[in-house]
């Protein structure tokens, strides 16, 4: 594959960031989705750098919401091969430094290159381990792997469910996540920081609500399915999310946008909507507050030894048994001699 020139490398990451910035829920359900096609194309050309690109999209404020919608889509779609979108293509890394290229891409797009969410160290490590593991385990050999795709689907959904649960737990303290926001004493800086804090808070609350709502919908649809792989995945979700007792929510929930309409009778696991004092403020409220207060209180700096990107190095020895590399290779193509319908399976093409 060889190393990519900076211009081409920036173009690949540019496509990923832009796609996640505009990602709508249920993109996977649409035939010929431009967003899914773009992500598949990026994935096919970045080799083993794919999990690192996804990691950066997870923690950067511009792409965080879209990335999490993407993960929720994979966790709740009927397309059993959609998880292959998390797998890398090939055995080479064409990037010399993914984080550096990501920083250059942010500058190219007019984004701040230091606006990364500050996740707790435990989740940062778990997220990195998860993405690295899926890079190998979400691959499918078209010659042999497609015949046991349902079994592989169940294991992948169990892993994704645990990732979403870890995110749900780690996102309870939004003040910690926004600890990177440190304005100076100018009104413009204070206003910008408050707006970004409100944006991040609103997006995190929205993701938390989407996770529980969509997981509950999946359980309702498939817990009694005649297809064993759907039934097993629904059972796993039921155990992970304790739907009978409800998933506790420490934060209020925002209003649902058009592409995130609530399901009918979502059940007890959907956290209640709160309109109390902790509800995120809109831009006008924040602007007035900043304009009328010259002495803004200092921003609290969260404790913990976590870097701006908060991701420790992944160690293969720490991979769980379920996520150990299983030897599958990615030879996915759009056509196969047995004429499998990859669109129906939801298998991501590798070329």
Curated annotation (Swiss-Prot):
Entry-linked Pfam families: Phyto_Pns9_10 (PF05878)
Gene Ontology cellular-component annotations: host cell cytoplasm; viral outer capsid
Region (Disordered): 246-308
Ranges annotated as biased composition (Basic and acidic residues): 285-297
Cell compartments where the protein resides: Virion; Host cytoplasm
Main localization category: virion
InterPro entries assigned: Phyto_Pns9_10 (IPR008776)
Function, in words: Minor outer capsid protein.
Family indicated by similarity: Belongs to the phytoreovirus minor outer capsid protein P9 family.
Protein name: Minor outer capsid protein P9
Organism lineage: Viruses, Riboviria, Orthornavirae, Duplornaviricota, Resentoviricetes
